[in-house]
Structures are given as C-alpha cells and as structure tokens.
Amino acid sequence: MHLEITDLNRVFVGKRGSVVALKNINMHIETGEFVCAVGASGSGKSTLLRLIAGLDTPTSGTINVDGQRVTGPGADRGMVFQHYSLFPWMTVRQNVEFGLKLQGCSQKERFDTASYYLDVVGLINFSEAYPRELSGGMKQRVAIARSLACHPKVLLMDEPFGALDIQTKERMHEYLIDIWQRLQCSILMITHDVEEAVFLAQRVYVLSSRPGTIQRELTINLPGDEETPKNRTYKIKREPEFFKYSDEISSLLRGRETEETEAIAS
C-alpha cells in the first residue's frame, strides 16, 4: 500500500469570505507504517482525514492510494471516529459484520471474519453484548475491529481516544500497538496529544494552524524499536529520547501559537 498526498489544498468559501483550511500538504505512507499527524485546533487535522477518506473534496491537489486517485469513500480506507459510531440496536458481532454484509459476504465469511477481529481486539467473549453494556475503551475496540474486518489498505483514525480517561487511553495505546504489529496494517492517526503521537508513531507530521501546513516531518526512533516486535510500553516515556521528541514537537506547536498571538495583537 502506498498513500500519496500531493499539493493538497482545501478552501472553504462562505458569506464572510474564504478560509484556507489546508495549504500545500504533501505526505506519504508506506505499507505497514504507523504515521501520526499532530496539530492544535484549527490545523485542519480532521479536514485532512475526511479528504483522505473521500468524505470531502479537495480544492486542488491529489490523493492516491496505490496509484488510484481518491474521488470518494472506498473499501480501501477504513475510518475510526473520535465519537463512538456503533449502532446501538446491534450486538457487537453485528456491528463488526455490518460492512461485510454491505459487501455481500456470505454468512459464514462474516461470522469467521468478525470472530477473528474480535479475538484480535480482545472482545470475542463480548460478541453478543450491546454497545450500552461496554466501556468507552471497549466501544472503540469494536469500532477498530469493524474497520479492520473490511480489510482496508489503510486505517484512518480521527482522535479515537480523545474522549477516554488517561488510564483507559494508555491501555488503548498498547492495544493499538499490538494490533498494528500483529496485522502489519498501515495506520494514519490524527491527534492533538503530542505524547500520544510520539508513543504510537514511526513518523510524525507536525501541522501548523490557520492555514494547516506541514511544519516538519519527524522519524521516531525509541529504545526497543530495533526489536521485532517493537517493544513500546509505557516505560518508554521515561527515556530521554521520548522527552526529546515530545519537546521538539511541543516547541514547534507553541512557536506557531506565539506567532499567531503576536499577529493578532499587532
């Protein structure tokens, strides 16, 4: 899988004039990579993900998946949203099978595929439960299983853990690292949480705000990354390298905010 974003721009036109949400975005994601795009509010993170998902149309520029131009939603891109997007009247299994049913898969194929991915996310014993019976973290694991069940080439994640408490979020990070390494899937996740980006990603794109542009691209190399599988647990947050990357990204974001504040004041 190769995701290529070239000279991407998105301008919104309203009664009060034009707003440039994204300007000259160039990014790429290779097969099996975990990439994060981090930025503050107003950096166009969610707009970027919606464009890649085919839920919005760029003003100019191109998005290609394996050389095919994105012109709308497709099964080659899975999406996990920040807010729980499960159907409350369906069981966990039915939620995971939903996309497969739309694709015309047989009942046996739906059952087997859903069982596999529910096992991957550690929820096989909750197959017949309803979303109301699950915690927030469990709901997001179901959403991840549902997206993965359709075998997307890239999994798009829109701040999926933003509504979770810190302890649940940390557990979800380790679940996600394990899922990514077991399935060797490609993931693009957007977040405003700097430590989340450094902990999860192999590469991080730092976005500025108003308009959203790429300030910098960083390759993350933490102790244990040379191992197979990568040994990323929460002990890694004590390492000097983790602080270095987090501080560099935070400084970039703070620097941009300072420039904007000074511009408004003048």
Curated annotation (Swiss-Prot):
Sites where the protein binds ATP: G39, A40, S41, G42, S43, G44, K45, S46
EC number of the protein: 7.3.2.4
GO annotations of cellular component type: plasma membrane
Subcellular location: Cell inner membrane
Catalysed reactions, as listed in the record: nitrate(out) + ATP + H2O = nitrate(in) + ADP + phosphate + H(+)
InterPro entries in alphabetical order: AAA+_ATPase (IPR003593), ABC_transporter-like_ATP-bd (IPR003439), ABC_transporter-like_CS (IPR017871), ABC_transporter_ATP-bind (IPR050166), P-loop_NTPase (IPR027417)
Keywords: ATP-binding, Cell inner membrane, Cell membrane, Ion transport, Membrane, Nitrate assimilation, Nucleotide-binding, Translocase, Transport
Top EC class, one word: translocase
Quaternary structure, from the entry: The complex is composed of two ATP-binding proteins (NrtC and NrtD), two transmembrane proteins (NrtB) and a solute-binding protein (NrtA).
Protein name: Nitrate import ATP-binding protein NrtD
Organism: Synechocystis sp. (strain ATCC 27184 / PCC 6803 / Kazusa)
